[in-house]
Amino acid sequence: MTDSKYFTTNKKGEIFELKAELNNEKKEKRKEAVKKVIAAMTVGKDVSSLFPDVVNCMQTDNLELKKLVYLYLMNYAKSQPDMAIMAVNSFVKDCEDPNPLIRALAVRTMGCIRVDKITEYLCEPLRKCLKDEDPYVRKTAAVCVAKLHDINAQMVEDQGFLDSLRDLIADSNPMVVANAVAALSEISESHPNSNLLDLNPQNINKLLTALNECTEWGQIFILDCLSNYNPKDDREAQSICERVTPRLSHANSAVVLSAVKVLMKFLELLPKDSDYYNMLLKKLAPPLVTLLSGEPEVQYVALRNINLIVQKRPEILKQEIKVFFVKYNDPIYVKLEKLDIMIRLASQANIAQVLAELKEYATEVDVDFVRKAVRAIGRCAIKVEQSAERCVSTLLDLIQTKVNYVVQEAIVVIRDIFRKYPNKYESIIATLCENLDSLDEPDARAAMIWIVGEYAERIDNADELLESFLEGFHDESTQVQLTLLTAIVKLFLKKPSETQELVQQVLSLATQDSDNPDLRDRGYIYWRLLSTDPVTAKEVVLSEKPLISEETDLIEPTLLDELICHIGSLASVYHKPPNAFVEGSHGIHRKHLPIHHGSTDAGDSPVGTTTATNLEQPQVIPSQGDLLGDLLNLDLGPPVNVPQVSSMQMGAVDLLGGGLDSLVGQSFIPSSVPATFAPSPTPAVVSSGLNDLFELSTGIGMAPGGYVAPKAVWLPAVKAKGLEISGTFTHRQGHIYMEMNFTNKALQHMTDFAIQFNKNSFGVIPSTPLAIHTPLMPNQSIDVSLPLNTLGPVMKMEPLNNLQVAVKNNIDVFYFSCLIPLNVLFVEDGKMERQVFLATWKDIPNENELQFQIKECHLNADTVSSKLQNNNVYTIAKRNVEGQDMLYQSLKLTNGIWILAELRIQPGNPNYTLSLKCRAPEVSQYIYQVYDSILKN
């Protein structure tokens, strides 16, 4: 009889009987009792009260019974840690058993018992097992180290287990090597900068030797490890590729994908014009095609990975498009993936076959698949210009079928074709207008309205058509309302005499009867534009539109490179990096493809190899000396009266009596400051409705929404003989200002004010003298706006944005430090070209990339982008990947340091992920603080 009998009992109150059986003298009875306990545990019954009795059964030579007891222990040790200690002696004894199976079983079980009290007893047995004579024990112990590290990382390092793991890479048994690699890889995932694996040519050679002899899962561990290695040159990369290539013919699809991952990464390092490179591309195609003959689930995973490969290197599968033709019995999820890849591989050579297939798919019964097929025809027209006419003809044939969802999808697609090829296929508009009554989906209605508005001059009854949509204006979706508003304004600009009443009607509906702020705002913009300057309105609304791109759903190149490094993992199926869906993975080191420095192949990068290096090199910040000591020991001369200065003649004015100038060996404030940094005179602010509405409420010349840190007390009165200074920094009209408030809390008046800065990280100095021309009487305050520039001497401070200031008056000299918020150092020309951004991101070393969490932020991507742009942080590109908004941004500091940023925003998640890359990574922490401040204010 099988063991299933243990699961069929319905007895009540059997714990007492089991307890008696567990203490029976006969071995067979005890084994039967333990099986019953395990069965009860499996179906969810609480048998924890039998813990001492089950532990007593550990003292046996029967391997089956021992396994059952260990299984029980693993399940209940966490809930009964004090009782689990009882089993420690038995574990230690089993680790020295003559039978290697029992030794391995004992160390594996101890690793699975996640109880801190037990881990300290595990160290000695584990150390012995790592050096055990039997390879089965050694490979089990290797995995145990990773489990122990997860429980107590510090103890693993202190006990030297990581060194023992590294030694196992040179083990004679390939499975021991594979498990050691797996354990080290797992540990290094959570410690990305630890370099635990120490991958060098010698170790790589050992791994490649073991690769041929270990099991399939061992091969996967080794291949994944190889994919993290960066060969020193293309010769080494080719050597590794030659030894990995045989794995492409393996029966296990996971091994094949891991091998593909290694080869895809190392292809980056091979010369594009070499014979081996082209041969390797040809070798990659057959195994990928073979994966599509497996089960549907395997096919889907393979297709998701192939989608990435085709985006990176379409030439690999360009001759294999037929394997992606849909079969009638494919599940819908496989069909949709195949369709996507077909479009990516479509070219002038195969477009006839592809269109014939797509037309057939459009007659299927599955609505989602049909919609995607119709959309695919439009994508073909946009991608392959020579096929556009044939695609339009195919779409017209589909419209004639009068199948509602086919017609609606076709109209959406035709709108995009009109955008791509303006003034070419407008003859079909009449056919489209025949189907107006059947359109009930927002996308289709919006597309049709756009077409009517765009080509209103060619449609005789355009006003009647748009008026028919206007009848149910408030019942339409926002998308349709916005499109209709714009279309009627276009119609008015083309036929003003005939449509004046219509445009007034839609503007009234949008501005007075609508609760939607987007619609209302657009309505007001059009209304003001039309009423003030119709000529400008025409130029704005009827301006030439940019052509739409061929591929609108391509993955961003930097993300694509990262996903290529994760082929065969869940990230490649989700098309998201691991930190987007694995909880607590924000510290994981992000992977990137290597850069082949020996090639100037423009196909690899959208710009030449010199693009990134042509950027302005950041100023090197020298190390900080012992500045504070010198600053506090200034030999101050007699006070100097500061005249009212209208020009910039500053060379003769030594603000602090010569001490600070002698410290730095030159005047802090240059004798002549370029006009670029000359402060603009600040006009008096006269309150008026329009001024307040548009600009002056945010400060003269400051971008609306520009962040200004709240004023802080820099120098308390108790430390400055009654003088209190509070302040902040601002950035206005391209200039930096130090906004200060001086308060006299002493009993005597204060005069003869002067200010000077110490050397600092960004060379910040005053552009003009401190302009306090009247005595500061007791209990009086005065606001001072001091213009600054960054032409002064540079010395690295700690922290980096620290500014040491000396202020003099008729009483004494006072010293204080304040922190410059880095956003005031962001310059206006910090917007990179898109291609330069991509090349620079790749060129900056991966170790310079730092990742931060911006928590509790509830803004959408557009608001975030707008807020940051007001502070000279420019959004280069915005993508939506699987519902996640990704903003790619650049900014530039006054000293020429560029910072590149990737901001990930998941709608509904208040925590954003910010990745920063720059050539001076010590700046990143301060940039993150600025991002956090801007977005939370």
UniProtKB/Swiss-Prot annotation:
It is a peripheral membrane protein. The modification N-acetylthreonine is found at T2. Changing E849A: Strongly reduces interaction with LDLRAP1, ARRB1 and EPN1. No effect on DENND1B-binding. Expressed in the brain (at protein level). InterPro entries: AP_beta, AP_complex_bsu_1_2_4, ARM-like, ARM-type_fold, Armadillo, B-adaptin_app_sub_C, Clathrin/coatomer_adapt-like_N, Clathrin_a/b/g-adaptin_app_Ig. Changing Y888V: Strongly reduces interaction with SNAP91, EPN1 and clathrin. No effect on EPS15 binding. Abolishes interaction with ARRB1 and with DENND1B. One of its GO terms (cellular component) is synaptic vesicle. Adaptor protein complex 2 (AP-2) is a heterotetramer composed of two large adaptins (alpha-type subunit AP2A1 or AP2A2 and beta-type subunit AP2B1), a medium adaptin (mu-type subunit AP2M1) and a small adaptin (sigma-type subunit AP2S1). Interacts with EPN1. Interacts with EPS15; clathrin competes with EPS15. Interacts with SNAP91; clathrin competes with SNAP91. Interacts with CLTC; clathrin competes with EPS15, SNAP91 and PIP5K1C. Interacts with LDLRAP1. Interacts with AMPH and BIN1. Interacts with ARF6 (GDP-bound). This is AP-2 complex subunit beta. It comes from Homo sapiens (Human). The gene is AP2B1.
